Amino acid sequence: AHGYINPASVLMYAPKFAAGPQELSIIPHKDFKKVSTALKNVGGFHYIAKNLDELIDSPIEIGNHKIWDFKVNNIPHQIAFYGPAKVDSVKFLADVQKMAEEAQKVVGEHPCDHYLFIIHNLNRGGGGLEHLYSTTCQVTRSTYETTKGYQGIMNLLAHEYFHLWNVKRIRPKALGP
């Protein structure tokens, strides 16, 4: 079990309050020990966002998921890995780090001071969605067991990661903010 919140699906957009800083406190279920989000942690399970758009574009994973950390050019990256899967975590972490390093070489300066990959390992389904400082990706639990599946998750993560630049920062004004 876990909790996952996509704020764009559950928060109301209030233009009157959109420009100012936002605060969020999470009270996890008593059995859940971890919260992963790209929002700035200000202690415990309390978070802040610069404005409503940043809050709305910051998904939240709550539970007892695995957390793996790495850096790309001194920028902290984290993987929040929910659900059982037969994965070589050392190889997977190294491959995700290599992908992120190569992406930054292609595009140049990194637009974030931190980044979060939320990965849901499910019985079925899949896909991903980019966010301002993170992505949420869903794959089947067996994804890591075949070369084709493993290449698929790496392609998905690379695709969503490139959206840091193309879509989240390089886009028509109509797709603002």
Regions found by a protein language model. Give the residues of each.
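Juxtacatalytic substrate-recognition/specificity segment
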Residues: K66-P177
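Extended, low-hydrophobicity, Ser/Thr/Pro/Gly-biased non-transmembrane segments
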Residues: A1-E61
